[in-house]
């Protein structure tokens, strides 16, 4: 059956209605009123993050230059010569029954073996840190993929690396939420929303605790040298704990590489975010007039520690940030200021009594 045609409808008004914008009347502000306004700042974080990501990728995956190949070839040739000379000395000592020389050769072999073993271990740990960057790239590709079959195996590998047991409630919820009809993007997204926040919450607690300790230490300590040593030790310890949470075992060189990348990231991004975050509270609440100089320095050191922890978290995390779940300095700012104010109030209360 065919439906009957609807009758024609005639409209009285024109199709295009001229919209005249309405402007408010002009207002003039004096100097006192102008001081209450702050200029609007454009959010340049995505551009900075993209530039920082490129710098980090270049540092994690350096190019194989000719000089680097020549140095590596020279070291390999020198190592082969040392091994050959050691074998020749050992054979001569055995033939001449020079037991003292034979013992020296055995001791040298043990020392060389220990050195080679430590170098191999450090190289493996540094390779593991570089692999984490490749895993983030793979996760980013899977989050834009409509294929099937790779997402589940990838997420199970991440859970195994992080030490998450199969009976963990978050992992069980993830298993219950996925099914065969979902593509890789949906599987990885579910893992990022159900399982990954468990590790992120632990890393946030570590950052909050280290930032609070740095803030209070600077606020109450009168010795600058002790403050510097304490902050350096706490920052290195924070990086180690965050790397351990995300399943990365840091060696000496990989720890230096990660610390270098974190400092490079902070220096490249600049202090604009730090100044903006601190100024939001200090300008609005006039805390600069109520807090001492040491307390202000403590808050600054705590925020720098928090920023370092956030960047270390970003480098060790196997998944890229999605849905604006990246922690910000504002998450730790109010907590640090509240702790400093509480500490100062506790210090004034006994003196008043």
From Swiss-Prot:
List where in the cell it is found: Cell inner membrane
- Write out the transmembrane intervals: 70-90, 100-120, 213-233
Keywords for this protein:
Cell inner membrane, Cell membrane, Membrane, Transmembrane, Transmembrane helix
Q: Which Pfam families match?
A: DUF697
The protein's predominant localisation is membrane
Topology in the membrane? Multi-pass membrane protein
Q: What is this protein called in UniProt?
A: UPF0283 membrane protein YcjF
Q: Which gene encodes it?
A: ycjF
């Amino acid at each position: 059956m065919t439906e009957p045609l609807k009758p024609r409808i005639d409209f009285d008004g024109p199709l295009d209605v001229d919209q005249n914008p309405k402007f408010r009347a002009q207002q003039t502000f004096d100097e006192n009123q102008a001081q209450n306004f702050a200029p609007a700042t454009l959010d340049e974080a995505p551009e900075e993050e993209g530039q920082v990501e490129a710098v980090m990728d270049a540092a994690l995956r350096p190019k194989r230059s000719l000089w680097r190949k020549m140095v590596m070839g020279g070291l390999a040739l020198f190592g082969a010569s040392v091994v050959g000379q050691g074998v020749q000395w050992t054979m001569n000592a055995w033939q001449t029954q020079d037991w003292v020389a034979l013992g020296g050769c055995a001791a040298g072999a043990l020392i060389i073996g220990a050195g080679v073993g430590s170098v191999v271990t450090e190289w493996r740990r540094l390779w593991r840190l570089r692999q984490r960057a490749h895993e983030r790239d793979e996760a980013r590709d899977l989050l834009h993929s409509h294929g099937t079959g790779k997402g589940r195996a990838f997420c199970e590998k991440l859970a195994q690396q992080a030490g998450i047991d199969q009976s963990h409630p978050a992992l069980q919820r993830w298993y219950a939420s996925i099914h065969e009809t979902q593509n890789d993007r949906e599987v990885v997204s579910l893992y990022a929303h159900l399982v990954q926040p468990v590790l992120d919450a632990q890393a946030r607690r570590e950052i909050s605790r280290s930032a609070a300790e740095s803030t209070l230490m600077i606020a109450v300590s009168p010795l600058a040298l002790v403050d510097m040593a304490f902050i350096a030790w706490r920052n290195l310890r924070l990086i180690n704990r965050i790397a351990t949470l995300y399943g990365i075992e840091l060696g000496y060189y990989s720890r230096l590489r990660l610390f270098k990348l974190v400092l490079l990231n902070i220096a490249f991004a600049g202090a604009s975010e730090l100044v903006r975050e601190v100024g939001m509270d200090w300008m609005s609440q006039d805390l600069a007039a109520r807090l001492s100089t040491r307390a202000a320095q403590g808050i600054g050191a705590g925020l720098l520690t928090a920023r370092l922890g956030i960047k270390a978290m970003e480098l060790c995390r196997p998944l890229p940030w999605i849905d604006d779940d990246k922690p910000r300095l504002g998450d730790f700012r109010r907590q640090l200021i509240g702790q400093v104010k509480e500490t100062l109030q506790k210090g004034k209360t006994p003196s008043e009594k």
